[in-house]
Amino acid sequence: MRPQNVAGVAGTGALIMAAGALADQTVFHPTSLTAPFIEQFIESIPDSRWTVSRATKQTPVGDEIFSYVGQWEVEEPEVYPGIPGDKGLVLKTKAAHHAISTLFTEPIDPKGKSLVVQYEVKLQKGLECGGAYIKLLTDQQDEGLRAGEDYTDKTPFTIMFGPDKCGSTNKVHFIFRHKNPLTGEWEEKHLKNPPSPKITKTTALYTLITNPDQTFEILINDESVRKGSLLEDFDPAVNPPKEIDDPEDFKPETWVDEAEIEDITATKPDDWDEDAPMMITDTAAVKPVDWLEEEPETIPDPEAEKPEEWDDEEDGDWIPPMVPNPKCEDVSGCGPWTAPKIRNPDYKGKWTVPRIPNPDYKGPWAPRKIANPAFFEDLHPSDFTKIGGVGIELWTMTEDILFDNLYIGHDAAQAKKFAEETYHVKKPIEKEAEGSNEDELEEPSSLVEKVQLKVYEFLHLATFDIAQAIKQMPEVAAGLAAAVFTLLGMLLALFGFIGSAPTKVKQTTVKTKAVAPVAPAGEEEKKALDQAGVEIPAEGSKKRVTRSTKE
């Protein structure tokens, strides 16, 4: 073992021993830091400031059929536990809707300040299809904040931030809502090229920082993974373009936008042979001296034996399978030799009229620009609307997702110190418990689970963009549509809307054994079989010749 490897192993061992000793000495203590909002989930849900939603989710047609039946618990982690006594908010129910929220005693106003959002996620059973993001709920003094027992996916939010994974979706969301000052309408702004989340069973720390200079930064596990501008890196952009194409402007009929035209003066050269072949026989080629023309490329397998159950009367004459001729392995080739083909130097193909620059070409046409009547300019989108609370509203296929150590404030240095007290203490303990093995995330095993997961992936994508969901997973959309029509047809048939069933007529059929026709053997194959002493029935014979693979 090399000296540096010995040192590395010794260092790793020291870290593991230190982590184990740290776990023995460390117990959970609430932080002494103060910020606009800090949550460490010390109390059980009934005794805490958090309220589980009792609302129902509405379908697009207004039916209330999906309720938030997912259970929540405040408990210590079961997988790779960290600090003894440290609890978190755990999403407990698989394949269910969950919603829980809390309101601030005073709204948080980000105007003119930095905003820092930080929390931990522990995916104790991995993440098949679902999210682990949080929403900062919009303070609505005029309408009231629909949170608490009334909290739903329709509750307005100011910022949505956190990991999401399902099918092709695998990203850390950063979405903020912006109000159009002209129309008063709200529009979601989605981060372009978002980073990928950490899908592990140990704790991951997610941090979002926005600044008054309109910059932002996303950190995962205290490492920067994405930086950018609120004005430039979101879709759709905060500010619309100053100018737009004039919808009343049309391309003139005389506008020429064809850059090239055919040369009408060109004629086909007299020596242009359109019928010359592309490939010709190489007349200079010579047959290799070791080429065995009398030897076939394949021969009957000498090791093949007719199966004991083979019946010549029923199955036809048995013919052994063909194998490559071993005599041809170390020579240039076997069988009839033909000269190879080469490219014809006189080949020109079909003659076409050459193209020349168009003297009337004016270039590509574009409509003239006019002032955008919907233009406005907001140079400070970081002045988000006031935040009145925090909500977690998720639908996931994987249970036991743990949330802990939420921080919402204005001081990035304070958030980092909070992480040093919490995340950076538990992480080495978890890694020591995890050992040197990589996380083994559970995968769906049965066909039913796999189909169910595909359906959930489609529905998850549809919650953000139904058109994109159909585009990415057309087979699932078609399957769901077929299932709906099948169910509708069954219901109509059940109630007699399709008509009476036709009278069944008993039919008698006579079973006959089909005899497969025999394909005639090729000349080379006939030659090989003849050399092997295999008799080939003459045309018109009632027996069928059947090959068998080697048993």
Swiss-Prot record:
Region forming the signal peptide: 1-23
InterPro entries: Calret/calnex, Calret/calnex_CS, Calreticulin/calnexin_P_dom_sf, ConA-like_dom_sf
Ranges of the Cytoplasmic topological domain: 499-551
Chain segments annotated as transmembrane: 478-498
Protein's cellular compartments: Endoplasmic reticulum membrane
Assigned protein family: Belongs to the calreticulin family.
Name this protein carries in UniProt: Calnexin
